[in-house]
């Protein structure tokens, strides 16, 4: 793929990720600040196609654009960026070591578990500071944070798994099985 095509592809997927980030909704009414959006899906596709660094770049671009357009919450958007980059980066890194369907699944599972554990740790630090609340508030939200992140990254993984092959075939790039269509 030429440099111009890669730049165009990254731009299109960054814009797509930004747009779908507006489709946010809370999963748990008791923790309405935890909002699901499917914006890591385009970034994960890019990570599988072009590498983990490029996928992480898409996450960063979409979070900056979303912050500038809608979010007045720098802490929430920063956490979203850090967690999204860890998820997309780890999944892409594992996949690129041995491009296969099994490795893609393994990468997404490991990335989901890592990003969820990372979210729990970040929230343990941020919730008491951001909400100026005691650590007990974090403990109250712990089950929701755990479940939310498993669901979020799980949905992103499942959708990516089923969409990636079609997208890569359309673009005539590498498929999940590792075959190269670009000679």
Curated annotation (Swiss-Prot):
Q: Where in the cell is it found?
A: Cell inner membrane
Q: Name one GO biological process term.
A: riboflavin transport
Looking at the UniProt entry, the stretches that span the membrane are 9-29, 41-61, 75-95, 109-129, 144-164
Does the keyword field hold Transmembrane helix?
yes
Provide any one GO MF term from the record: riboflavin transmembrane transporter activity
User: What is any one of the record's Gene Ontology cellular component terms?
Assistant: plasma membrane
Arranged from A to Z, the UniProt key words for this protein are:
Cell inner membrane, Cell membrane, Membrane, Transmembrane, Transmembrane helix, Transport
Identify the Pfam families for this entry. ECF_trnsprt
**Membrane topology of this protein:** Multi-pass membrane protein
| Family according to the record | Belongs to the prokaryotic riboflavin transporter (P-RFT) (TC 2.A.87) family.
Quaternary organization:
Forms a stable energy-coupling factor (ECF) transporter complex composed of 2 membrane-embedded substrate-binding proteins (S component, RibU, BioY), 2 ATP-binding proteins (A component) and 2 transmembrane proteins (T component) upon coexpression in E.coli. A stable subcomplex with both A and T components are also isolated. This complex interacts with at least 2 substrate-specific components, BioY and RibU.
Kindly give the PANTHER family that the UniProt entry links to this protein.
Answer: RIBOFLAVIN TRANSPORTER RIBU (PTHR38438:SF1)
Indicate what this protein is called per its UniProt record: Riboflavin transporter RibU
Origin species = Thermotoga maritima (strain ATCC 43589 / DSM 3109 / JCM 10099 / NBRC 100826 / MSB8)
What taxonomic ancestry is recorded? Bacteria, Thermotogati, Thermotogota, Thermotogae, Thermotogales
Q: Gene encoding this polypeptide?
A: ribU
């Amino acid at each position: 793929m030429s440099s111009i095509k890669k730049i165009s592809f990254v731009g299109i997927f960054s814009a797509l990720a930004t747009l779908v980030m507006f489709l946010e909704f809370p999963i748990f009414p008791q923790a309405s600040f935890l909002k699901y959006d499917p914006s890591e899906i385009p970034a994960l596709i890019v990570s599988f196609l072009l590498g983990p660094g490029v996928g992480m770049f898409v996450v960063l671009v979409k979070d900056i654009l979303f912050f500038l357009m809608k979010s007045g919450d720098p802490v929430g958007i920063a956490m979203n960026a850090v967690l999204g980059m860890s998820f997309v980066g780890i999944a892409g890194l594992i996949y690129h070591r041995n491009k296969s369907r099994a490795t893609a699944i393994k990468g997404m599972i490991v990335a989901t578990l890592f990003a969820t554990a990372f979210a729990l740790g970040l929230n343990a630090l941020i919730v008491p500071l951001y909400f100026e609340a005691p650590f007990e508030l974090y403990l109250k939200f712990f089950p929701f944070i755990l479940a939310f992140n498993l669901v979020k990254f799980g949905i992103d993984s499942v959708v990516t798994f089923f969409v990636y092959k079609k997208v890569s075939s359309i673009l005539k790039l590498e498929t999940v099985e590792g075959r190269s269509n670009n000679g």
